[in-house]
Amino acid sequence: MDLRLLSFALGASSSLLWPWLPSLAWGGLLLSLLIPLAYCRTWRWLFLLLGILWMQANLAYRLAWLERLGDQTSHMITAELQSAEPEGDKFVRLLLRVSTLDEQPVTPEPLIRVNAYQALPAMTVGSRITLVTSLKPAHGLANEAGLDGRRLLLGKGITATGNLRRVIDIQQAPVGWRERWLGAATESWRPLDHAPLLAALTFGEQSGITDAQWELFRGSGLTHIIAISGQHIALVAVLGWWLGRLFGLRGAIITSLLFAAVYSALAGFAVATERALIMVLVWSVLRWSRREWPAWRIWLWAFVVLTLWDPFALYSAGFWLSFLAVAILLLVGYLHDKPGLWQIQLWLLLGLLPLQLALFEGIAPLAMVINLLAVPLFCIAIIPLALIGVLLAPLFTSLAYGLFWLADLGLGWVLTILNWLADQLQLWWPLPGWWLPLCTLLLLIWFAAKWRPARWLLLPGLCALLLALWPTPARWQLRVLDVGQGLAVLISKGERAILYDTGDRYPGGYNMADAVILPQLSHLGIRVIDRLIISHKDRDHAGNRKRLLSAMPVRHELSSYPFSGGTTLCQRGQQWRWQGLSFAVLWPERPGGGRNNDGCVVRISDGQRSVLLSADIERQAEQRLVALEGEGLASTLLVSPHHGSRTSSTPPFVAAVAAKEVIHSAGFMNQWGFPRPDVVARYRDARQWITGQQGAMLVEPTAAGLSVTAERDVGPWYRRSGEWWRPRVWFEQ
């Protein structure tokens, strides 16, 4: 049975690596194989195929509704409100369960996320809303580094996103018991300094936690404590078990399950709490039936049941972090008779390191020590005090306030120590991309040395480690980063870099420096920007200038706009050499302007190949450039002016540049329709790429010219460009 469960889990998990979403034809083929496999009693292969078939059928079924969106961007929907989270005072993020799309029912009812930038009336969870919204399939930025936005959305079960245009009707739902309880607790803890943290620990309401606090928790490794997760549900379940022992084994099981269910309900049945509750349910069923199963069998059953309950859970980082952490604990118990707390923490630190690097591209080196001290404080004092306070809040306000005050005092101590540590030390260490394979190989070698059956891995592991450390010659690379509707171009060689433009920043604090540029620089091991070029002052080009200047050293700044006294003004005729490349400023003729036509146009050449960065220049500047440069504008690759607007890319300019490759830096399904179809037609003799559709572009020199690799041309199905959700018989590039 255990190998069958493991086979099912492996089959289901393989969906993370599929290059495309298989069609029903593949499902039919798998079904036809099940009968002979069952006849031959090859159960491992049978359950492996069952896992694959389960994911294929479920993903195709749950994503099929996206076909109905078509090319239309505005839709009328009726949906049930799941949550409304304010992002500061800028907008409200609505989580909606859609029942009708354009007045037609939707099955199964999908989960979508809609941003509302206008004022909304107070709405209760469960209210039915009819609204008009832009709507597009789940999408995220696609770069070598930074969060995978699409996988993040799918991991939460969200399959489409949009912006609210207008509300047609709201049918308010009665205020639920959770909202009444939350209101009573909020009144009790309102005067306290750390009320938002108490709301997060008890009800999973995280909107009041600041970005600085999240950064602090990430650096200290305490994010898993603040965000309600399996650890919290397990703690409450254990508390219920302890209290229920007075009523015998089955009384303890019922009390434990009841406590876990109530806490999950308080947290709004968030995805992480649902997973933990199912694990508690699996364990409870086994204990109720008095089955004495080993821990790893319970682990396998929980994995399979969760996959059956919510196939999208496999795309959640929290799912893998929690299950891998439990697997490591089981392994420690197998290798050590009585492991100490420090041994457990060390194994968790090392075992989770590759996954943490893959997901977050950095480590918190002090996390083990901080967790050794903080976790007992939270589990023994802060969380129990806060939860008992919540239970008492509706009836005994003063007593609840006293308990909240004690929990708040503990939170104050923790934050004081963490802030002091953050002032003295760098808590979060972003690491270059090569750390991931290196740490994975080292961990594999260490594990093989510790566990006798795995020692055959030592030799191949050492050989792979040698290859990973073997130095390779550095050559220049150019990346047009996927920054949505904006521009950011990174030119690098080894650990040296020049950055051209910085992308946009948005209401609520989200910005392309923290989301894309800084992770990309860290991934490449770049710690200093040799030259920062800001083409002009528009926010989608210069929006993150201050953030970058504060985040890392910049040796020289060049711009067409005088941002500060340290900014060198960009002017035609400027030239310099850098790492074997020649840079020439072709425009503007007169510095100091801030309009599109004043943008800093730069031509980069290695003597054989050339790239033209054309900012947001339009017809007037293009005409003058053609007159000044003529055939000198000819370039191998062009980053199109003004994101592909029809006010730019005039036929004379297109003919003069005569690029073989053209990259349009434009957001996915942007409101301006960039690049415009007529502009795309003007470049019909060149290969064209759009960052919003195909992700970041990696440009490298080759003997034949320049190679362009799109981020969405590689990787699993959910990272692909085009209609990634559509099942296919075969992979289509």
Regions found by a protein language model. Give the residues of each.
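Hydrophobic alpha-helical segments of integral membrane proteins
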Residues: 15, 19, 32, 36, 174-189, 197, 205, 213, ...
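Hydrophobic alpha-helical transmembrane segments in multi-pass membrane proteins
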Residues: 3, 40-47, 162, 210-370, ...
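N-terminal leader/targeting segments
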Residues: 1-69, 73-74, 151, 161-168, ...
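Alpha-helical transmembrane segments of polytopic membrane proteins
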Residues: 22-32, 321-322, 371-379, 433-436
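Membrane-interface helix/helix-cap signal primarily in integral membrane proteins
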Residues: 51-224, 510, 515-524, 528, ...
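Non-globular, low-confidence helical/coil segments that flank catalytic cores
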Residues: 78, 118-134, 152, 172-173, ...
